[in-house]
UniProtKB/Swiss-Prot annotation:
Keywords: Copper, Oxygen transport, Secreted, Transport
Localisation per UniProt entry: Secreted, Extracellular space
Functional description taken from the UniProt entry: Hemocyanins are copper-containing oxygen carriers occurring freely dissolved in the hemolymph of many mollusks and arthropods.
Gene Ontology MF annotations: oxygen carrier activity
Protein's recorded name: Hemocyanin subunit 4
Presence of keyword Transport: yes
Primary site of residence: secreted
Organism: Maja squinado (Mediterranean spider crab)
């Protein structure tokens, strides 16, 4: 569950940056 949660957070960050761009 740890790694999966971390990947989810990274994905969310990428999406945020993509939207912010």
């Amino acid at each position: 569950d740890g790694p999966a949660q971390k990947q989810n957070t990274v994905n969310q960050l990428l999406v945020l940056i993509y939207l912010y761009k």
